[in-house]
Structure formats: C-alpha cells, structure tokens
Swiss-Prot record:
Function statement: Transcription factor which regulates nonfermentable carbon utilization.
Compartments reported by the entry: Nucleus
UniProt main location, coarse: nucleus
UniProt-listed InterPro entries: ERT1_acuK_gluconeogen_tf, PAS, PAS_13, Zn2-C6_fun-type_DNA-bd_sf, Zn2Cys6_DnaBD
Annotated protein name in UniProt: Glucose starvation modulator protein 1
Record keywords, A-Z: DNA-binding, Metal-binding, Nucleus, Transcription, Transcription regulation, Zinc
GO terms of molecular function: DNA-binding transcription factor activity, RNA polymerase II-specific; RNA polymerase II transcription regulatory region sequence-specific DNA binding; zinc ion binding
Cellular component, GO annotation: nucleus
UniProt DNA-binding region: 5-33
Any one GO biological process: cellular response to starvation
Sequence ranges of Polar residues compositional bias: 268-299
Listed Low complexity bias regions: 47-63
Length: 629
C-alpha cells in the first residue's frame, strides 16, 4: 500500500510512491516531500525493543551519511531531545533566550548553566534506556507546518538573526585553532575553551559570538557551511593579511609598476612591499593619459598645445634626472644620446594639431588619392592581358572586385545627355525623356526587388561569374567567326569586340577597350531608343508575358518562322541562341563606322543572367544590310 506524503495527505490528493512526488514537484516543494507519519499503536514488550533498535540504527546511519562536527559534549543528548519531542522554544531553562542577543552581559553565566544542564540531562537519559524506549515522540498537529526545529531552515534563520543582531561577522569553526576543535569532542569542551572563543566574549574584531554554535540542540553543524545571503562584512571578514582591497592600488601612475599600492590605514609597510614584489611587471602598457587631460575625456585636437612638453609624454626623461642625481655627472656618451633623443622628440612634437591630423591621414600633407584609385577599375583591355584562360581567373582572384555600376550609370547619363541634348532639338529631348521613363517604370522596380537581399559576397560572386562567362563567350565568338560580335554589360559598357566587328566598323581594339566606352556611342539616337525599349521589355528580366507578346506579334502580321516582318517590331525568340540558354530578340539598327557614317545592320541581342535573374552580359551580333539604290 502506497503511503501518501504530508502535503497529499493534507490536501486529499492521490500520491505516487516516488519521492519527491509529482504533486510536490509541480508546486516547487520537492525538498519538503516526506511520508506522512501515522499514529503508532501500542506495542508489546518485544515490539518495543525492536523499535528502540530501529531508532538507534537510524540515528547512527544519519551521522554516517554526512560529515559533521560534534560541538557539544555528547551527541546522544541532541538525539534524545529529538526522539522525545523536545521543543526548545518552550524550554527557556536551557538558555535559548540568548539567541536574540538581548542579554549580552549574562552570556557566560547562561553558557555554563545551560551547558551543564544539557550534559546532565543527556547523561541521565542515556543511563536510563528503558525510559527512552517507553517515550513516544508526540505528533505536531498544527496542520500548517510539520518541520521540526532541527532543520536546515531553522539553522539558516538563526544565522540570519545573528547577522542582524551583532556588529561583526560570525566566527566559523574553520577559523578556530586545532587545539580548540580537538577539545570540542570531550565532555568538558566548553569549560576548556579559551575566553576569547567562548560565546558572549569579545574577539579580535570586537564582536560577540552566538551561543547556538556550541549547544548541540538540533541538527549538528556541517563542516562546509554555506552562506546563501550577502553581507557587507564578508569582504573584511574573509580578508587575509596578504590581500589588500582594490582601493589601495593606484592605476593612474605611469611606469612599469603602475599598479603600485598606496599606504593604507591598518596595513604595515612590510606587507605593502611584499605585495608589490608579488605583482608581475607589466611591460605592455595601455595608452598613457596626459596630465592636462582626464582619462575619460575624448581626444580633442583643438585643445592640444602647439608645442607638447616632452616630459609630460615620455617617462624616460624623468628617470634620467634621478640617474643624474644618484650617479653624479653623466658621461659624454650619455649627453650625446640624450641630445639626439630630445632633438628627435622636439622635431616630432613641434607641430600644430592640424598637422598632426594631416600626418595621420596622409604623411605627405596633400589630398589623398585613395578615393580615385578605388574608382579606377582595370580596363577590359588590360584585364584580358592578365587573365587569358579560366585558370588565370582563379589564380589571380585578387584582380576581381565588385563592379562600380553606380559610377558607370553616372557616366552613361552624361553620355546620353551628350548624344540627345547636343543640338537642343525637341525631338531628341522627347526621346531622352522616353528612355528615362522606360528605365524608371520597367527596369528600376524589378532590379531593386531582385538585389535588395544581396550582400557584398554576392556582388563578388556576380563579378566572378561575369568574367567566367565572358571567357566562354569569347571562345565561342572565335569559333563562330562569320558575324561581327560585341559584348557589353547591362549598363552598356563594352567588354569585348571580335575581329570581325573591328573590320566592319574600322575601329581598333585598344581604342574601344582601353577606356570606358558604351555601345550607345556606336548607335544612332533612334537605335538607342529601340534598344532600351526592347531590353527593358524582353531582355532585362525576361518577357513579362511571353505568350501574350507572341500572340500580339502574330496578330500584327509578324511571323517567327520567316514571314514578312514589320520594320519597327522585333522578333522575340525563346530558343537557345548563340550557345546560350537565355532569351534573345532580332531587330535592326544603324551602326557607327570610323568614318562617321552609319551602317544599317540586322542585330541579334542575347542576354546572359545570373542565379538571381539579374542580367550580366548582352551579346550583340551585327549583320550588315546593303540596300540597292
């Protein structure tokens, strides 16, 4: 039959056999979970002896499980009190009124009387085992709390009361001499204790100790007592002679031993010297603080003097004066060394605050050109001389960096303004407005949505993919050498031109690729407008509605398979073209020649995108159209 615990018995709950039970664990009272003691029935003579032996065995097992210090003269006195249901709160004859520290003057008298009474009672009960066997511990039936006096909670409460009712920290048994702790196991332990250790007497700290530390009423004290509360006296109580408080160190002085202790009240000079020798010398110092400036204040160049004092910065010069006074007149070599160092330091510190800031940014004092160098990317012509095969691309990855498209688009706008606004024609101005409108409505929203989650590493990977794809397209262009080919970025910046394109236009390769040149520089204004319209509609991110566009083209009389085509509408194809897996369109344009004339060409524009569906490269194939006069 399962016995219910005290809580489940009181609340009439179903209790499980485990301890602590589930109900106590749920209510965070697992430490208080114990079996409910039932009323003992009257036993015969045989059962009494068995019960007495069980009580003795339980007492011995309890003492063996925990390492305890027996403070009183006889441990059996405390166990007899517990077995007989002794209530120390009601027995004021045993000196428990001294726990409140209200009668400090009579502590010695109460100690002697209470201890003698406790020892006599323990001897009397131990000499009469029959009486002890007949005693039955009464049950506490208050219904709210069944915890006995000899519990850990009661000991903690008395320890807290001791902290509140006395001036100094409690004296632990670990701080007693060995001779005192050895005498505690004897019958006359309290009588043999020295006066400085007896409760109620004054100790080294000028505080009186508690009587409950020597009376064995309740559970014996454990060797490793814990203090689950914080006291302001813990620092002074746990401080040893060779340890100084943090306030005794000076952290503002400069030098190797900048953690030098200051003389404090109550500490001798020898202790300070020993502790200073024990501190390791710190050779690596933090940034020194000027005497005219607080350590917490920020660096302000305007507040610095035009000529900084060397003695305030360097601690070595202060040490030189001490060496001179101790050793007498310095030698000539020492004077020469000191003069050289002083001249060098004066040369350094005889500068204005602005000169100091300029020297930190640029030693030469002129404007930095780092910003210009960052924008100056490697030209396609020079890059192809360094990277010719895919192996070179991976061996020289330091040449790869994200392309500055912002600067490229800025140059593109300047070029478009130069093309369309040079003659102040209303037609050209309207064409430029249509290009800007097409960019803002068709290209920018989708581009921002695709690139909003990209990081710097993605931009690097995008540029690496572009260069690797460009190598493949160049090798393919060399194999298919029947048509002129030009490859440019999505911003229109030319990256590659084939030999046939150079022969068709009459330009040189270095003339096109050595600097930033756009494909729009080689097209007439009408072809530029058509390019932006077709690129944003079909090539940039794919056709918006491929089926709808094909149906509309068929209705307009545009046939994909070779029928007559209107001149103003391009042919859209979704089949693989020129070895790429991207969409392409057919259209016509006018290509600029080196002599200044435009040549009508049929073009095929193919786009290559990355994994983010962002266009990387556009390849244009140009076939000249010779019309008869």
């Amino acid at each position: 039959m399962v016995k219910a615990c005290e809580f489940c018995h009181e609340k009439h709950l179903h209790c499980d056999p485990g301890r602590p039970c589930i109900n106590c664990v749920k209510r965070n009272r697992g430490q208080l979970c114990r079996d409910k003691e039932r009323k003992k029935s009257k036993k015969s003579g045989v059962e009494k002896s068995v019960g007495g032996s069980d009580a003795q065995s339980s007492g011995s097992s309890q003492s063996n499980n925990t390492a305890e210090v027996n403070v009183s003269a006889d441990y059996t006195a405390g166990t007899m009190f517990n077995n007989m249901g002794f209530d120390p709160l009601q027995q004021s004859n045993y000196g428990f009124d001294t726990m409140t520290r209200q009668n400090n003057n009579n502590d010695n008298t109460l100690l002697n009387s209470s201890n003698n009474n406790a020892i006599d009672m323990g001897n009397r009960w131990s000499s009469q085992p029959d009486v002890v066997d007949n005693m039955v511990s009464p049950n506490i039936t208050d219904g709210s709390n069944t915890v006995e006096f000899d519990s850990a909670w009661a000991n903690n409460e008395y320890m807290k009361l001791d902290e509140l009712t006395k001036n100094g920290p409690p004296m632990m048994f670990s701080s007693y001499p060995n001779s005192v702790t050895e005498n505690l196991d004897q019958d006359n332990a309290v009588e043999d204790l020295p006066i400085s250790v007896l409760p109620g007497s004054k100790t080294k700290n000028g505080t009186a100790e508690n009587l409950s530390q020597f009376l064995n009423i309740g559970r014996p004290l454990h060797k490793t007592q814990s203090r689950p509360y914080i006291s302001l006296d813990m620092m002074t109580a746990g401080m040893k002679d060779d340890i100084l408080p943090p306030e005794t160190y000076n952290t503002t002085s400069l030098g190797d031993n900048y953690l030098s202790p200051i003389n404090s009240v109550g500490s001798s000079t020898n202790q300070l010297n020993d502790y200073q020798d024990s501190i390791p010398h710190q050779k690596t110092m933090t940034s020194p603080v000027l005497p005219t400036q607080s350590p917490s204040s920020a660096f302000n160049p305007a507040k610095l003097p035009t000529q900084v004092s060397i003695s305030a910065i360097s601690p070595d010069d202060n040490n030189e004066d001490d060496q001179k006074s101790s050793s007498g007149i310095p030698s000539k070599s020492d004077k020469e060394k000191n003069n050289k160092t002083k001249k060098a330091k004066e040369k350094i510190f005889k500068t204005s605050p602005n000169d100091i800031l300029i020297s930190k940014k640029n030693p030469k004092g002129h404007k930095s050109t780092k910003r210009k160098n960052e924008k100056a990317d490697i030209s396609p012509y020079k890059f192809r001389q360094l990277v010719k095969v895919p192996e070179d691309l991976y061996e020289k990855q330091y040449l790869i960096k994200p392309h500055n498209y912002r600067h490229t688009y800025k140059k593109l706008l300047e070029q478009l303004e130069k093309i369309f606004l040079s003659d102040n024609s209303p037609k050209r101005r309207g064409q430029l407005q249509s290009i800007v409108k097409c960019i803002l409505e068709d290209y920018v929203p989708t581009f921002i949505a695709l690139t909003s989650n990209m990081i710097e590493s993605d931009l690097y990977l995008q540029e690496l993919t572009l260069q690797r794809t460009l190598l493949e397209l160049e090798s393919m262009a060399k194999l298919v050498n029947c048509s002129p080919i030009c490859i440019w970025r999505r911003s229109g910046e030319i990256s590659y031109v084939s030999d046939e394109f150079l022969q068709l236009t009459g330009f040189k390769r270095k003339e096109i690729l050595a600097s930033r040149r756009f494909i729009f520089e080689f097209l007439d204004p009408t072809s530029i407008v058509n390019y932006f319209t077709n690129f944003h509609e079909y090539l940039a991110f794919g056709s918006k509605n491929q089926m709808t566009s094909n149906i509309s083209l068929i209705k307009q009389g545009l046939l994909v398979n070779g029928a007559v085509v209107r001149k103003s509408n391009p042919i859209v194809s979704s089949s693989p073209m020129c070895g790429t897996n991207t969409d392409g369109i057919f259209d016509e344009c006018h290509l600029l020649l080196s002599n200044g004339y435009y040549l009508k060409c049929a073009t095929c524009w193919t786009v290559k995108r990355d994994s983010f569906n962002i266009p990387l490269l556009i390849m244009g194939q140009f076939l000249p159209v010779f019309e008869g006069q």
